[in-house]
Amino acid sequence: MRVLALDSSGIVASVAVVEDDILVAEYTVNYKKTHSQTLLPMLDEIVKMTELDLKTIDAIAVAKGPGSFTGLRIGSATAKGLGLALDKPLVGIPTVEALAYNLYDVNGLICPIMDARRKQVYTGIYRYEDHRLMTVKDQMAVGIEELLSMLNDMGEAVTFLGDGVPVFKDIIADKLTVPFSFAPAHLSRQRAGAVGALGVLYYKEGRTETAAEHKPVSYTHLTLPTR
C-alpha cells in the first residue's frame, strides 16, 4: 500500500511517500521558513521526482499533534484538502509517537520531548517489546522537572529526542539519576518517513478517519498528570 505522509507539527517541515516497508522519498527542512512557504512546494517536488500520481495513494498520514498551533493547522488543512480532493482516508499520527518511532528497537525507555514553553514539554514515554513500539506513559503535557522525576522513579535508562533536548539538556543532566543519552541529529526531529511508516500500520489496523473527521490535537486535549 502507498501512503503520503506530512509532518509540520514543529519547526521541521517534512513530506514523505511510503510504500509498504519502503521509504520511497522523504523531503525534510529544518530552517527559518514558515510551513505555509515550504510544505506545498516540498509536496510538489516529491510528486515530480517520484512521478507520483496522487490518485494512486491509499491514505494520507499526518502528524496530528501536539505541537505548534500554526504548524499543526497548516498540516491538517493540507491533509484534509488532499483527502477531500482525492477521496482518500486520513491517518492521524500522534507527533511524539512518530518521534519515538525514529528510534526503532532501541533498548530502554524512549522519551520524545517537545518544548511547550514555560518549562513544560509535550511528551510520552515508550519502549520496544518484540519489535513493537509500546506506550509506557500516554502523550501528555508536563513540567520538565515532573517528567524527570517520573523517569527517575522508573529506574531505567532513557534516550531523549525532540526539539526540547537543546532547551532542557542542562536540567536533564542535573536532575536525572538514571543513565541517559540523546538521539543523534538525523533522528532527533520529526520525520515524515516515521509518520508514513506508522500510517501503514495504523491503516492496516483500521485506524483511519475521513477528512471531515480529522482534527489536530491541541494542548487542551492532552493529559495533565496529577501533581
PLM regions and their residue ranges:
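Glycine-rich phosphate-binding/hydrolytic loop that grips phosphoryl groups
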Residues: P184-S218
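Surface "functional belts" at beta-alpha junctions
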Residues: I22, P89-S188
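Short glycine-aspartate micro-motif
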Residues: V3-A5, A61, G71, I110-I113
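Conserved small/polar residues in nucleotide/adenosyl-binding loops
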Residues: T220-T226
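Conserved hydrophobic/aromatic positions in well-ordered beta-strands
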Residues: A16, Y122-Y126, V217
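DPxDG-like acidic metal-binding loop motif
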Residues: A61-L90, T95
